[in-house]
Amino acid sequence: MYLNQRIKFFLERVVRMMDENRSKGNRWGVWAFFGILLVPLLVPLLCCAGPILLVALGSTGIGALFAGATGNWWLTGIFAALAIVMIALILSKLLKNKYNSPEGNGKTKNKTDCCTPPESVDRKHETR
């Protein structure tokens, strides 16, 4: 019973803070701008990093929701830095896979194939 009361109190407080932030002007526009900037990254990364990207953006979005609801600039800054770090890691992985090949010449055999199967899978000798 005590836990239910605390959860109810927390949710009421979040709703109250969101209402107060609407009148002051909040930073939802900034997060929408970040979301629009992330859309071009979704298309090339759906093969390799799609699930990672969706989880990362979802967790950052939930964090941004609470940061916007509480009006805390420090929390907003932390989630903005987290989003930038995630984007940098995903882009570095994408560029590493694109420009590093086993031959060491900087060119990949097939640029569209970003998801390679594990080494243990031998697809030439598969039996059905």
From Swiss-Prot:
GO CC entries: plasma membrane
Region of interest (Disordered), residue spans: 101-128
GO MF, one annotated term: metal ion binding
Residues at which Hg(2+) binds: 47-48, 114-115
Cellular localization per UniProt: Cell membrane
Transmembrane stretches, start-end: 28-48, 71-91
Membrane topology classification: Multi-pass membrane protein
GO biological process, alphabetically ordered: response to mercury ion
Record key words, sorted: Cell membrane, Membrane, Mercuric resistance, Mercury, Metal-binding, Plasmid, Transmembrane, Transmembrane helix, Transport
Role noted for this protein: Involved in mercuric transport. Passes a mercury ion from the MerP protein to the mercuric reductase MerA.
Descriptive protein name: Mercuric transport protein
Organism annotation: Staphylococcus aureus
Gene: merT
